[in-house]
Amino acid sequence: MRVNDDPVHSGADQFLQWMSVDPTDGSVNVQFYDRREDPANRRTRVTLARSTDGGKTFTNYAWSEVPFTGENAFLGDYEWCSAYGGRVYGIWAEAAPEGYEVSSRGRGAAAAARPRTPTIIRVGVADFKAAGATSR
């Protein structure tokens, strides 16, 4: 079954998927990290793919607001997707935008020397019962 709708063998990575089936309407919902928008295959977005025909076809929706680079972030550590009543709820991790500052107390020079990319936990809600849901 093909979930993503970018060209076959495009070279773009899609990874760390999570699936949920809505028990009220039978829709199949898959959340995944997606690099199709970046020819260099580094910047990532979170995509929600939804099927209302038992998984025969999927419509893809850009779920995260802006693409991010996930280097040194904890992608996949905080991921979840659930669906009920025509609504899909998702949680995912993103690397913080450039310039985002985090302060922590480390121990010695080794702690200060480690590259650190702050990880942000995002929550998404897609309401397919509401009018106007649009795909990518």
Regions found by a protein language model. Give the residues of each.
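Extracellular, repeat-based ectodomains that mediate carbohydrate processing or recognition
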Residues: M1-R136
